[in-house]
Swiss-Prot record:
GO BP terms: cell wall organization; peptidoglycan biosynthetic process; regulation of cell shape
Subcellular location as annotated: Cell inner membrane
Family that this chain belongs to: Belongs to the glycosyltransferase 51 family.
Protein name in the entry: Biosynthetic peptidoglycan transglycosylase
Organism per entry: Burkholderia multivorans (strain ATCC 17616 / 249)
Enzyme's top EC category: transferase
Pathway(s): Cell wall biogenesis; peptidoglycan biosynthesis
Record-linked HAMAP family: PGT_MtgA
EC number(s) reported in the record: 2.4.99.28
Segments crossing the lipid bilayer: 19-39
Gene label: mtgA
Entry-linked InterPro entries: Glyco_trans_51, Lysozyme-like_dom_sf, PBP_transglycosylase, Pep_trsgly
Catalytically driven reaction(s): [GlcNAc-(1->4)-Mur2Ac(oyl-L-Ala-gamma-D-Glu-L-Lys-D-Ala-D-Ala)](n)-di-trans,octa-cis-undecaprenyl diphosphate + beta-D-GlcNAc-(1->4)-Mur2Ac(oyl-L-Ala-gamma-D-Glu-L-Lys-D-Ala-D-Ala)-di-trans,octa-cis-undecaprenyl diphosphate = [GlcNAc-(1->4)-Mur2Ac(oyl-L-Ala-gamma-D-Glu-L-Lys-D-Ala-D-Ala)](n+1)-di-trans,octa-cis-undecaprenyl diphosphate + di-trans,octa-cis-undecaprenyl diphosphate + H(+)
One GO location term (cellular component): plasma membrane
Described purpose of this protein according to its UniProt entry: Peptidoglycan polymerase that catalyzes glycan chain elongation from lipid-linked precursors.
Length: 245
């Protein structure tokens, strides 16, 4: 559209064209973000992640504490983490982890119905791989947009990494309390031993904490934790670890 005033001609861009421009910019930004995630994950097939989105957020808040505090985190190889802890987490968080494709459709549908009944997001039906996707790149915010991005990153993780590597990164990056990340830091923080020495009962209690690590950190030794740990301990023997284990 061209508007004419006297001898001056002014080009006016139509609203439709602005919408097309904005859509193109948004699409380009979205694709660039997905490419960034994809490349990062591909690199992690042979390089360990330095930190996660959750760690960086916590580090900022901890630095403003009085006195300032730091993240507790120490990467250890997969074979230096107790099999008890691996089995406890799979028994608690994702029983079909070794064989699923990163998604549990039944759990997702159940979470959808629960959220619809509550009128807000209260459950996510997340597998271990989905939890890792969220921890690595996203925030604690609960929204359907974030959930959609989580599902895309989950596909990338399952496509680019094998199950053992996914589990190794998860074990080294999952939160176990305010500022406590990874199996090694958790084992030393709660039991003053390395992750390789965690027993079955200790592992079961740590697995219970994963959905609400900060709450359990502040309410250690609760009756619920003990009851839930007993259930997990009974299931650990049937937990299937990734094939190479």
């Amino acid at each position: 559209m061209v508007a004419v005033t006297g001898t001056q001609r002014t080009r006016v861009v139509s609203p439709t064209r602005w919408i097309v421009y904005a859509g193109a910019v948004f699409a380009a930004a979205w694709l660039a973000t997905q490419l960034f995630y994809f490349v990062q994950i591909a690199m992690w097939s042979f390089v360990n992640p330095g930190s996660t989105a959750f760690m960086r957020t916590d580090a900022w808040w901890l630095s403003h504490d009085t006195p300032p505090a730091q993240i507790q985190h120490q990467w250890v190889p997969y074979d230096k983490i107790s099999r008890n802890l691996k089995r406890a987490i799979i028994a608690s968080e994702d029983a079909t982890f070794a064989t699923n494709n990163g998604y549990d459709v039944d759990a997702i549908l159940q979470a959808w119905e629960k959220n619809k009944a509550r009128g807000r997001i209260v459950a996510g039906g997340s597998t271990i791989t989905q939890q890792l996707a969220r921890n690595l790149f996203l925030s604690r915010e609960k929204s359907y947009i974030r959930k959609g991005q989580e599902l895309i990153i989950t596909w990338m993780l399952e496509t680019l990494l094998d199950k053992e590597r996914i589990f190794e990164i998860y074990l080294n990056s999952v939160e176990w309390g305010r500022g406590v990340y990874g199996a090694e830091a958790a084992a030393r923080y709660y039991y003053r031993i390395p992750a390789s020495r965690l027993g079955a009962w200790q592992s079961a209690r740590l697995a219970v904490m994963l959905p609400k690590p900060r709450w359990f950190d502040a309410h250690r030794g609760s009756a619920y934790q003990a009851q839930r740990a007993a259930i997990i301990a009974r299931r650990m023997g049937a937990a299937e670890l990734p094939q190479s284990e």
